[in-house]
Amino acid sequence: MKIINEDLASLKRLVQTKTQQLTDLKVESAVREIIANVIKNGDAAVKDYETQFDKVTLTDFKLSQTVIDDAYNNLDPQVKDALLLAKRNITSFHEKEKATGFIDAEQPGVLRGQKLMPLNRVGLYVPGGTAAYPSTLLMSALPAKIAGVNEVIMVTPPQVDGINPAVLAAAKIAGVDAIYQVGGAQAIAALAYGTESIPAVDKIIGPGNIFVATAKKQVFGQVAIDMVAGPSEIGILADDSADPRQLAADLLSQAEHDRRARPILITDSADLAQAVSDNVTSQLKVLPREAIATDAVNEKGFIAVVAKIEEMFDLMNTVAPEHLEVQLKNPTQYLNLIKNAGSVFLGRYASEPLGDYVAGPNHILPTSGTARFSSPLGVYDFVKRTSFIQYTKDALAKEAPAITTLARVEGLEGHARAIESRFDTYYD
């Protein structure tokens, strides 16, 4: 794993360059065509794309409840227990995110407030094949259910041998209302616009490949989306108290996700940097997903050596990683130095996969530097806020002069006259 010793300004330029994402114009065009076809031809277009891309011919998109129940009932008990533990912890954490509206009646004759309402229907995209992650389904569906979403539906690519049983079991555990065997950009189009069989949703949640991500970008505005997810990232801050073998293992835990994944270590110890690099090399040789992880390490990964701890945090805040591990002496004392990170793991026993599965905080996180302005998925992503006001005549009379003055300053005479009509002033 490459080790970089440069000044802080040069390192910042390096990480910003590595964060930049290029638009693939061919993908943009192909996805635009898929969406237009689904809008025009509905189920027929979706079936054609499933035959073309997933090599599966479907007569019915919706999966029967019998198939879902069988997957749950026949699931390995150890896997089922792990999913149920994850559900308990995810639920207990996200229950604490629930917010309430408010009513303000402090001013005489004035009632103001805000009410929170759950979305009516959301769609969860769950990748298929080797990227079928039941944990991600729990992280998507459970906050929606806690928020009170009326209907949670799931789409996932059909498989020749059937959908991953653990994913189906997780859907049942999380209370998903319906599952449709549809994948790719055509699934996103179906969720956004609806077809004869698949209902349109209010928001689309979940990661996918570049076609799914591009489709989510293109349908945004017709529906809400959670985020446009990029490759997985891990940033680790470590001093000489950290174990280089553990640091290497944590870096590889994300590198094995994707050839474009980004594993980064920033340290003030040159000796630790070399030890971690050596351990990454040796651990890669025995990793089942060696080829994928090796590409990620070589193309996107690096170890940066800086002069002091403050520079470590300064540089990492520029990275704004999806996952941030702080493996320093007394890590909690540095929480106030963390400005940009999707999720933070403090100390050597808070290894990143703990958050992936059972700790409880959501693992659907901002990537590609978007932790500068974005947050993890949560209950708040499945509710909308609506404000309301009520005034008595006397209360309106008190504020009418200010309203009409501002309306006329903005050249909106009709606004002013609407207020004046409440006091029998008309311009007929």
UniProtKB/Swiss-Prot annotation:
Q: How is this protein annotated for GO cellular component?
A: cytosol
- Which controlled-vocabulary keywords does the entry list? Amino-acid biosynthesis, Histidine biosynthesis, Metal-binding, NAD, Oxidoreductase, Zinc
Instruction: Read off the CDD domains from this record.
Output: Histidinol_dh (cd06572)
Residues bound to substrate: 232, 254, 257, 323, 356, 410, 415
Q: What is its EC number?
A: 1.1.1.23
Protein origin, superkingdom:
Bacteria
Q: Example GO biological process term?
A: L-histidine biosynthetic process
Cofactor, free-text remark:
Binds 1 zinc ion per subunit.
Query: What cofactor is this protein dependent on?
Result: Zn(2+)
Q: Which residues bind NAD(+)?
A: 125, 186, 209
Metabolic or biological pathway, per its Swiss-Prot or TrEMBL entry:
Amino-acid biosynthesis; L-histidine biosynthesis; L-histidine from 5-phospho-alpha-D-ribose 1-diphosphate: step 9/9
A Pfam family this protein belongs to?
Histidinol_dh
Which catalytic reaction applies to this protein?
A: L-histidinol + 2 NAD(+) + H2O = L-histidine + 2 NADH + 3 H(+)
Function, as annotated, reads: Catalyzes the sequential NAD-dependent oxidations of L-histidinol to L-histidinaldehyde and then to L-histidine.
Matching entries from HAMAP family are given as: HisD (MF_01024)
What name goes with this protein? Answer: Histidinol dehydrogenase
**Organism for this UniProt entry:** Lactiplantibacillus plantarum (strain ATCC BAA-793 / NCIMB 8826 / WCFS1) (Lactobacillus plantarum)
State the organism's lineage: Bacteria, Bacillati, Bacillota, Bacilli, Lactobacillales
In the UniProt record, what gene is named as encoding this protein?
hisD
